[in-house]
Amino acid sequence: MRVIRSLLLLTIAIIGSVLSQSSIDDGYTVFYSQPDNYYVKPGTFSNGVAQAIFSNEMMTTGWSFMSISSSEGLYPNDIIAAGAGYLEGYISQEMIYQNWMNMYNNEYHNVIGSDVENWIQENLQYLQTMIDSAPSNDLYWQNVETVLTQITYMQRGYNQSVIDNGVDASQSLGITEFFLMNMDGDMIDLGPALNLTNGKQVTSPATATSPKQAFKEFMRRTGHCSALIKMTDDLSDLFSGHTTWSSYYEMVRMFKVYNLKYLFNGQPPASKVTMFSGYPGTLSSIDDFYLLDTKIVVIETTNGLMNNNLYHLITSESVLSWIRVIVANRLATGGESWCQTFSLYNSGTYNNQWIIVDYNKFIKGYGALDGTLYILEQVPDYVEYGDQTAILRTGYWPSFNIPFYENIYGLTGFNETYAQFGNWFSYQASPRSMIFKRDANNIHSLTQFQAMLRYNNWQNDPFSQGNAGNQISSRFDLVTADDPNNQYLDPDAFGGIDSKVVSADMVAALLVNAQSGPSHDNETPFTWNSQWNQKYTYAGQPTTWNFDWMTMSLQSMKPASPSSDSSSDSTTFN
């Protein structure tokens, strides 16, 4: 075990939350010189390896924005990946450090276990062996190699920024820290697996001795999220949306656009542009929410494992979820091919329900063709997926952290937790399932869809059972600890931390509407008050979260325009 500069870094992190910049720049360019040198200059220059637009508007919008594009036809894949990573690490060093310190202090309690470090090294050795032994024209491993190159050089650019900008050397980070930021979702399952391997006691929802302990473990293992795919009754539109559930200390947010002009075997990948809600220092969303230029939307919510029966199947000789989703996004031409690619080299970590919406197969006024909606669910050593467009044609597809496929439901231990604790663990009758059944088919516009994804009206909604955590965008900070009816939930700075939505027209135009922070449509905006600011580090965040919707495009973010039909909308559910 190693303890890393805890008290000093905690102090710096808190100071950083006050000093964090709120500026919009005119762009940056990264240049390459032989044999392996990269340097960053302000401004955008077409002869560089890659160009970036970056703004940190956390204090005014709840978001930062990063758009990185590579120059076309000038450099090979390894230099494009290295340059893009170096550039991002260099210009967003402050925010990466804030994100890491919030995670390090709150999640790892200032200690990284040697078992985690060793597993990462074993996994990297496996990946390098597979890359080296794969045929030179193997698309999968070529793409994995670019991902590893990008993160390696992100760390290098980050540390060079620390040096060049006179930042305290204690802020330098190793490759382990960068991998842990990207593995945040995978650690939900890898952490318990390593603990069991080391002979430690691991409580699961299935072995809990009380409903409250069971639900606490359930939330820890399935902390992400709510999602909804909604086809309007007149078949004129198809909405896709996602609300991330997470600890509030993780609200240092960065919406990202990658437009990296790779050529694999002389051809570009199916998808060249990826837009996603993410975090400083991460190459994947982790939420997850992606809009691709192939007109495919990729979303997930976490199912998790309710028992410990499958953790022994997790091995370092696999590809972690955060890498597999990047590769699948690039190579997929539709829902089925996405599922086929993602299923390869299953790590058994971050066991999610993946929702793949192919807008190429949605026809306005006609509806959804077969293949519009694919659903994939994963557990260690097993993946199941299929075309679920028929369900979408009934009006909507909901997702709320409970498995859809019967085999997955059984393998993950939900049968046992349902038998013991009832409808909290029921696909058909859990609180969010019932809310979607009641309200989803009352959505007719984008404004209403946004309101649904941000929905929290726990005081008046009977399905909340008097609890602010039982809503589409939960607010566990509002849970009343001494409520005699509350046998399940404890108050915590945890809940829905954002929402992202698209319509058919927005997908075609590569636009995303996004709102950051806990839901405040019907509730008081969340504030880091004395109840929470002494319990958690929240470097880089505003004190109060009261922000509106933003529209993200390829090169900017701006306040979202009111929907043209908003005047006639009724956005009150329940």
UniProtKB/Swiss-Prot annotation:
EC number: 3.1.1.-
Keywords of this entry: Glycoprotein, Hydrolase, Lipid degradation, Lipid metabolism, Secreted, Signal
Leading EC class: hydrolase
Subcellular localization: Secreted
Protein name, as recorded: Phospholipase B-like protein A
Primary localization: secreted
Gene Ontology molecular functions: phospholipase activity
InterPro entries: PLipase_B-like
